[in-house]
């Protein structure tokens, strides 16, 4: 055993129960290798691992050096939003569909992870967004997002009107179905589907992508990640929401503004040594192949 990662957490809730076999295989293999292993409590209960050391996501973030997320991108997003608060590295084994954030192939995960545990890996920091919904002198509702923060109508799709301020300076007003505010990580997710640009992960930039704007002149906007975005609403005829990674919703009420900024802490991602962002674009999203 080496000292790159001594305590390893196993997390993630795959859509298909059969994928839980990966968790058990991983748990037994890591124990046999001499690592201290913490497995997420709910997973241990489902697998009936009565002798396993268990913990919540927060406890794993506090105690482990590396978290292995087993599942798809949704599992990675949900776990990583919590784990990013702590000094822990994160890597994923893909048991979902696309697996853009989960690098390890389930059929070869043990060997790939063994190489990582021996110190053969790439470390990368990805920044998150923090969204605040607040009114003057009122308590804030706060959440974070790894991919994107989306302004949209509540339950029924319709046009909404809002103003966008960047660093407290008016930028533009819009009448549209909403607005996608994306990190470089999220630029290949919902933002891409709406016509937004692809940003390489190392860029300190945020994209603002309109959703079906009722104008001929609206275009995606790329700004520095150090900027603070403020959304204002003058005529709220119906409920609006802020959605974080399509997993957490924050309702917006009359008289409230939305503030979106770069989060104070990053996500520490671990990739295999042969990881290439552009190879991932090609294999997962059909990016152009090499000609020669």
Swiss-Prot record:
Top EC category: transferase
Pfam families noted in UniProt: NAD_kinase, NAD_kinase_C
Cofactors required: a divalent metal cation
Active site (catalytic residues): 73 (proton acceptor)
Reaction equation(s) it catalyzes: NAD(+) + ATP = ADP + NADP(+) + H(+)
Binding, NAD(+): 73-74, 147-148, 158, 175, 177, 188-193, 247
Keyword Magnesium: no
Disulfide bonds: none
Keywords, alphabetical: ATP-binding, Cytoplasm, Kinase, NAD, NADP, Nucleotide-binding, Transferase
EC number in record: 2.7.1.23
Molecular function GO labels: ATP binding; metal ion binding; NAD binding; NAD+ kinase activity
Subcellular location: Cytoplasm
A biological-process GO annotation: NAD metabolic process
A GO cellular component annotation in the UniProt record: cytoplasm
Keyword DNA-binding appears in the UniProt entry: no
Protein's job: Involved in the regulation of the intracellular balance of NAD and NADP, and is a key enzyme in the biosynthesis of NADP. Catalyzes specifically the phosphorylation on 2'-hydroxyl of the adenosine moiety of NAD to yield NADP.
Entry similarity comment: Belongs to the NAD kinase family.
The protein, known as: NAD kinase
């Amino acid at each position: 055993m080496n000292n790159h990662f001594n305590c390893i957490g196993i997390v993630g809730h795959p859509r298909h129960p059969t994928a839980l076999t990966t968790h058990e295989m991983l748990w037994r293999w890591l124990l046999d290798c001499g690592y201290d292993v913490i497995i997420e409590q709910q997973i241990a209960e489902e697998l009936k691992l009565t002798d396993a050391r268990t913990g919540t996501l927060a406890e794993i973030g506090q105690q482990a050096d590396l978290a292995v997320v087993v599942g798809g991108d949704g599992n990675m997003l949900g776990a990583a939003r919590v784990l990013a608060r702590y000094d822990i590295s994160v890597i994923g084994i893909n048991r979902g569909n696309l697996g853009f954030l989960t690098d390890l192939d389930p059929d070869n995960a043990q060997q790939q992870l063994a190489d990582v545990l021996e110190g053969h890996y790439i470390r990368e920091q990805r920044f998150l967004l923090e969204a605040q919904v607040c009114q003057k002198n009122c308590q804030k509702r706060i959440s974070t997002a790894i991919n994107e923060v989306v302004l949209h109508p509540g339950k029924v799709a319709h046009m909404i009107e809002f103003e966008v301020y960047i660093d407290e300076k008016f930028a533009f007003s819009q009448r549209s179905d909403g607005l996608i505010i994306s990190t470089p990580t999220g630029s290949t997710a919902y933002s891409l589907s709406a016509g937004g640009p692809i940003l390489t992960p190392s860029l300190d930039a945020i994209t603002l992508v309109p959703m079906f704007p009722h104008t001929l002149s609206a275009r995606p906007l790329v700004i520095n990640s150090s900027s603070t975005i403020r959304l204002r609403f003058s005529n709220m005829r119906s409920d609006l929401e802020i959605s974080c990674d399509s997993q957490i919703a924050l309702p917006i009420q009359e008289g409230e503004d939305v503030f979106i900024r770069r989060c104070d802490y990053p996500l520490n991602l671990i990739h295999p040594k042969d990881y290439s962002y552009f190879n991932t674009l090609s294999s997962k999203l059909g990016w152009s192949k090499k000609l020669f």
